[in-house]
Amino acid sequence: MKFTRLCAASLVAVIGLSTLGSTQAFAADDATELDSTGKVTITEGEVGGGTDTKDPEKPTEPITDGGGEEITTQPNKGPYGIQAVSNLNFGTFSRQSATVEKFSQPVKIYGAEKDALGNPVITDGKLTADMNDERLRGQYVQWADLRDGGNGYQIQAKMTEQFANGSNKLVGATIDYSNGILNYNTAQLGTMPKMGATVFQLTEDPAASAVVVATADAGAGKGEYFAEYGQSAGFVGVDGIENTLDTTGSSVKLTVPAAVAASAPTGDYVAKVTWTMVAQ
């Protein structure tokens, strides 16, 4: 339409000049056109703060654990880092003279309550849960890289504290992860990170190397990602394949040696798994 209007204006100008009998040539540069400019400034993004948690199986949807103890969120902020990790709950077992194997319970999360404009509701610095939108997920870690530049990174996992109750420890206890997948918002452009070990074991051995969960080469891995261990039935991954079995409660296993299971004092035992984003 702009081209049509410009041509019509030129024709009128030529006719006008011809009528006046002018011998001046028509000037291509005239006062009928002027450019404006558009400006935008891009800065590094920010991750962390506790309100950027999302569903590992629906990466665009904000979620919360509803004030429970299912998820630990990142209180600090920066242009890259670990945003959230799920906490393992292996339930209860009775003292016995046999090796104990217990699977972690699924992670219970809730969709975030939305305001009239569709934005997540934040109360006291935390997402407000829609208690009518309960979801069960596998154990997971969420991270993001919104740096300007950077030469890639690794996501690593390591058992940094053995299960302990005061001075009592479950010596030799291990945690096995399986059914690992990488998930992300497919609208993100660029090269994605590579999934590391999909099956691995964490032990208390201080000499053991951290397990590499995911790796991003230089210039890759920008955006937000999830590694999830166990998926709900019906979940469709980025490969387009539907998960037909619910593995949310059968993918992370605690093993306690028989000698320890028979003699450990009763009580609550807590271990620590540290997830680290090692930037290059």
Language-model segment annotations:
Residues L11-L20:
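Hydrophobic core
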